[in-house]
């Protein structure tokens, strides 16, 4: 192993601006659970003053969520994220992971394990049992997370659908009138978008959790992108992105998965689209992870789905009269530095009332497998966010966030608190708006001969399977 490089921590002057931005510090009040305290520990590790298997060191470094909320508030530009990653790789090389963490990571390393596991989970979810068993205890919270992974039903109230249908009819009338009044005028938007589609081909990254528990978000991603002029393809041979392994310090496992994805996604496309903030952050970092020109070229093409939609407007849909609180995933706002695009997507939905609550930029406590291996701390972090939802006036009808872990963690927390709030991905709202507004022309999600999704090599794409 090469000598660990902690130079990204050099600018730290221990000013403490990071403390109020750190979820674990806010939850415990312990300096060692803050970025500043952890930097002191990492420097001691670097100098050999503390062993890599020291119980206290491991406890405080493992407790870091990796949310990177400390970086944007740091006046000195400390690269905390890079430092904690170096430390975790050093710790991983010197100890065995706890059995639960090792087992979970082992599953995600093997598609032949996680795909059947999530298929069974999806069947269980379909019975409605997880929703009935959801609660505040450890088992109940886990059931709540599984229930929250399903498609949010009843997002659009009846009066909203009626308003959207009326708006669609009015838009159709305006389009017809415009066409009649101008000979040789441009064709309606759908024709223009179809002609533009060939100029922008995007490869959908399937992932693991998104491709199984959140296949409906893949469907919405494809539909909304195609409605905005993109051609969506789904290359075969993709696996888990490796983010969970990288966060645990298992660089070798992350690299192995990244190489498989690099080979699968190497086909010609203008972009690689990701609808999971955690996956997108790592894919954008494949160049650094694999240290190769090919990986860097792929990473440069990676975009969050909201980035691609925002580049095209996106085109407006039908009205949805809903109070929506946008909750920014840490790995979208901090790691990828994507702030405006999700709001632009939501702003394209007429009548949507968008709010940014005080907790919107704070971590929810999901952090990959963190909520599984450190449930008490994850719940303590989450509770601060759930309180902000409950205290909002009015309480939002919908929370929109763009990461599967966040969708499940926040959804379970809302169920445990007894709040009637739906949690959805932003593209689900845009997709619903397009349905209400008649953008899909009554054929949303359908292909000749069967279910939704473009097929590559006979595989269904983004469908409920």
Predicted feature locations:
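Cysteine-centered iron-sulfur cluster-binding motifs in ferredoxin-type domains/subunits
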Residues: 6-25, 54, 58-78, 361
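Non-heme iron-sulfur electron-transfer modules
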Residues: 25-56, 77-103, 424
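Iron-sulfur cluster-binding electron-transfer modules in prokaryotic oxidoreductases
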Residues: 80-465
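N-terminal glycine-rich anion-binding loops that anchor highly charged ligand groups
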Residues: 17-20, 30-35, 230-236
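Short, charged low-complexity linear segments at domain edges
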Residues: 1-4, 33-55, 215-216, 338-347
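Short, intrinsically disordered, charge-biased short linear motifs at domain edges
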Residues: 1-9, 50-61, 226-230, 349-354
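Residue-level recognition of specific faces of alpha-helices
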Residues: 11, 38, 60-63, 301, ...
């Amino acid at each position: 192993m090469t000598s660990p490089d902690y130079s990204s921590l050099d600018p730290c002057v221990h000013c403490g601006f990071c403390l109020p931005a750190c979820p674990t510090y806010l939850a415990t009040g312990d300096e060692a659970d803050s970025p500043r305290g952890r930097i002191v520990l990492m420097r001691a590790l670097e100098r050999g003053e503390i062993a890599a298997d020291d119980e206290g060191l491991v406890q405080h470094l493992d407790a870091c969520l990796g949310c990177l909320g400390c970086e944007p508030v740091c006046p000195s530009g400390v690269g905390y994220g890079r430092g904690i990653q170096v430390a975790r790789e050093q710790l991983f090389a010197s100890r065995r992971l706890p059995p639960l963490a090792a087992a979970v990571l082992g599953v995600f390393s093997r598609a032949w394990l996680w795909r059947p596991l999530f298929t069974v989970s999806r069947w269980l979810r379909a019975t409605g049992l997880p929703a009935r068993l959801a609660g505040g205890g450890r088992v109940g919270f886990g059931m709540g997370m599984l229930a929250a992974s399903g498609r949010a039903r009843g997002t659009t109230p009846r009066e909203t659908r009626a308003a959207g249908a009326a708006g669609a009819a009015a838009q159709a009338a305006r389009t017809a009138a415009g066409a009649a009044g101008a000979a040789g005028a441009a064709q309606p938007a759908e024709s223009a978008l179809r002609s533009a589609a060939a100029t922008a081909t995007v490869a959908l990254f399937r992932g693991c959790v998104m491709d199984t528990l959140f296949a409906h978000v893949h469907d919405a991603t494809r539909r909304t992108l195609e409605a905005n002029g993109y051609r969506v393809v789904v290359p075969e041979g993709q696996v888990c992105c490796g983010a969970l392994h990288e966060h645990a310090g298992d660089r070798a496992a992350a690299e192995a998965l990244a190489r498989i994805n690099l080979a699968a996604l190497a086909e010609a496309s203008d972009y690689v689209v990701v609808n999971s903030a955690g996956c997108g952050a790592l894919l954008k970092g494949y160049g650094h992870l694999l240290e190769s020109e090919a990986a860097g070229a792929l990473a440069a093409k990676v975009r969050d789905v909201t980035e691609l939609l925002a580049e095209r407007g996106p085109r407006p849909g039908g009205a949805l009269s809903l109070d929506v609180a946008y909750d920014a995933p840490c790995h979208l706002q901090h790691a990828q530095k994507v702030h405006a695009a999700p709001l632009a997507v939501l702003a394209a939905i007429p009548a949507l009332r968008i709010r940014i609550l005080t907790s919107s930029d704070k971590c929810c406590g999901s952090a990959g497998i963190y909520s599984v291996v450190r449930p008490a701390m994850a719940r303590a972090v989450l509770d601060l966010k759930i309180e902000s939802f409950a205290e909002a006036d009015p309480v939002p009808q919908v929370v929109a966030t763009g990461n599967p872990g966040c969708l499940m963690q926040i959804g379970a927390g809302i169920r445990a608190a007894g709040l009637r709030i739906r949690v959805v991905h932003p593209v689900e709202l845009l997709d619903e708006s397009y349905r209400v507004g008649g953008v899909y022309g009554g054929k949303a999600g359908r292909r000749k001969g069967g279910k939704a999704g473009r097929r590559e090599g006979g595989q269904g794409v983004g469908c409920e399977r």
